[in-house]
């Protein structure tokens, strides 16, 4: 027993059995896509794990750290200066482990997300694509629906597409989500259930980014310097470290 230690825990709040079973099905679907990713890749279908990392702070220590000496650990300046924040929209190719088309900037609007998805698709424009992501509203937007229609050359008329909040595919978040999940599309989305960010492999890579670059030892003199360092780290990671994660379902963390 370690009474001095504790950890957060989220108890399930099951108010609707049907919705609960639907979310369980979603977990299984995401898992099945990960398992099938190598075979899908062989058949020209690319699987991407996609999300945003927001509020990345550009902090600089007021003074340089004092190096370790015999008998003393390294001493880092406690006070720091803020130089703004940025963000990152990124996809991780599930089979190759490569970080694809990172969008490093402060904003994360629905148009930003569509821009990122477009750039990822254009890396392999002749193939099909599956994006695993969460149910954020910008991931189920009108702009994304229209991109999938245009890119997939679905040839839908405006009456079928409808008007946001009123009719057709665009009527509601639910109708847009159903359209984006359509198995027949060249570009489709698989959504993780609420409180299941652990299912999204890009979250594990964000943790790598924090440990390797955005840690307490880091110091960034400006927002631009922060963004440049993130871009450089991604290039280094793709060149030297990228590999598929080994998925485990026995309570252990994903292993690189």
PLM regions and their residue ranges:
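C-terminal anion-handling pockets and recognition modules
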Residues: 184-196, 203-256
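Acidic/histidine-rich, metal-coordinating catalytic segments
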Residues: 127-140, 164-167
């Amino acid at each position: 027993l370690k009474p001095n230690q504790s950890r957060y825990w989220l108890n399930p709040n099951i108010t609707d059995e049907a919705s609960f079973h639907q979310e369980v099905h979603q977990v299984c679907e995401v898992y099945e896509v990960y398992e099938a990713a190598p075979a899908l890749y062989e058949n020209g279908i690319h699987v991407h794990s996609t999300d945003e990392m927001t509020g990345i702070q550009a902090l600089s220590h007021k003074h340089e750290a004092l190096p370790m000496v015999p008998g003393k650990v390294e001493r880092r300046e406690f006070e720091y200066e803020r130089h703004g924040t940025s963000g990152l929209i990124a996809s991780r190719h599930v089979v190759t482990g490569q970080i694809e088309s990172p969008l490093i900037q402060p904003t994360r609007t629905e148009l930003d997300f569509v821009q990122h998805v477009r750039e990822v698709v254009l890396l392999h424009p002749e193939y099909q694509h599956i994006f695993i992501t969460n149910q954020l509203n910008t991931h189920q937007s009108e702009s994304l629906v229209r991109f999938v229609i245009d890119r997939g050359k679905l040839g839908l008329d405006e009456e079928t597409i409808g008007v946001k909040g009123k009719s057709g595919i665009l009527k509601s978040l639910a109708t847009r989500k159903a359209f984006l999940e359509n198995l027949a599309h060249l570009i489709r989305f698989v959504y993780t259930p609420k409180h299941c960010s652990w299912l999204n492999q890009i979250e594990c890579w964000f943790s790598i980014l924090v440990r390797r670059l955005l840690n307490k030892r880091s110091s960034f003199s400006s927002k631009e310097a922060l963004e440049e360092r993130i871009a450089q780290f991604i290039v280094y990671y793709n060149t030297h470290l990228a590999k598929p994660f080994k998925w485990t379902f026995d309570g252990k963390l994903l292993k690189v």
